[in-house]
Design a protein with these regions (language model features):
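Intrinsically disordered, low-complexity serine/threonine- and proline-rich regulatory segments
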Residues: 1-15
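Hydrophobic core segments within long, regular secondary-structure runs in both alpha-
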Residues: 4-7, 46, 71, 88
Length: 144
């Protein structure tokens, strides 16, 4: 299925739940980010994902921190990898974004943080990511 057809089905909530997996979520987010500035893509994808979850009878499935964090990571990769890449090439170069479990978010968040009600309802900043200063200090001291 081409990108626009998948997005259209997603927006109409016509994709069957067993036919819309993590990789499809990433693909739709990737499409939004190629078409819209980051704030608009975040708003559109989030609103449509909420509607999709509601249509599937799972209104509590939407998770703000997971959704926002993935869009931020995808956007960063698009900027680094060039927005002109076709989906299959982008997916091949970014395999770590395509795996749901284990998730790339484990690099940035503690499990209990993502499991919190606060992280579900509003975006929470990463709590596992070390600052560049801390990494540089460890490197200078020879501690790894």
């Amino acid at each position: 299925m081409d990108d626009e057809s998948l997005v259209r089905l997603f927006e109409r909530t016509e994709v069957p739940p067993d036919g819309f997996h993590h990789r499809d979520h990433v693909r739709v987010a990737w499409w939004y980010l190629r078409q819209h500035p980051l704030p608009d893509a975040l708003a559109r994808f989030g609103a449509n994902l909420r509607r999709f979850a509601l249509a599937q009878g799972k209104p509590d499935l939407f998770h703000e921190t997971i959704t926002t964090a993935y869009l931020l990571l995808i956007n960063e990769r698009l900027d680094a990898e060039h927005r002109g890449l076709a989906w299959e090439e982008f997916a091949a170069r970014n395999g770590d974004l395509m795996t749901w479990k284990p998730s790339i978010l484990a690099r940035y968040y503690r499990e209990e943080t993502l499991a919190s009600p606060k992280a579900k309802r509003t975006f929470v900043m990463p709590d596992r990511l070390q600052t560049a200063d801390a990494i540089n200090e460890r490197a200078k001291s020879g501690k790894d």
